[in-house]
């Protein structure tokens, strides 16, 4: 059993985590507002903007805050993990279409981040290359994951 000091430390850590998440969610909301305006200025329609922002809200406020408190800039390194694994497992609506849509949303979002110099140009270039190279693998993974005839261990061996 954990000592009183250990339990207090865990509560403090949890409280710090919750406070950090709350702050990041506020920052993310402001960033998504800026992103939405950027998309509108680029000529995208309201439904498309809403779709991109919904996809990004899930990525920013669920995936990046799931086990850690990662900023959107930190998250550029985790897009592959999100699209190729986490999204497929955690989003009950995951399918080939939604993986492609999320890839497009993330690509646009990180283009916006790069334009604003919130990430380095080489990080954005690496992200685009990763999406280009890995998208077929991610689509295959989601197809296998959603196929009741496929053994789960064949998709993600333990």
Segments and roles (model prediction):
Residues 1-119, 125-158:
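Charge-rich, intrinsically disordered N-terminal extensions
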């Amino acid at each position: 059993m954990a000592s009183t000091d250990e339990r207090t430390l865990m509560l403090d850590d949890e409280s710090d985590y919750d406070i950090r998440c709350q702050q990041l969610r506020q920052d993310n909301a402001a960033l998504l507002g800026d992103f939405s305006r950027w998309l509108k200025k680029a000529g995208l329609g309201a439904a498309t903007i809403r779709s991109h922002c919904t996809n990004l809200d899930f990525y920013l406020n669920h995936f990046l805050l799931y086990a850690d408190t990662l900023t959107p800039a930190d998250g550029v390194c985790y897009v592959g993990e999100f699209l190729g694994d986490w999204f497929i497992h955690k989003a009950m609506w995951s399918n080939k279409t939604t993986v492609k849509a999320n890839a497009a949303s993330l690509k646009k979002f990180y283009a916006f981040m790069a334009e604003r110099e919130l990430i380095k140009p080489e990080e954005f270039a690496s992200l685009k290359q990763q999406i280009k190279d890995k998208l077929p693998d991610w689509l295959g993974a989601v197809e296998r994951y959603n196929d009741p005839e496929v053994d789960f261990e064949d998709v993600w061996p333990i």
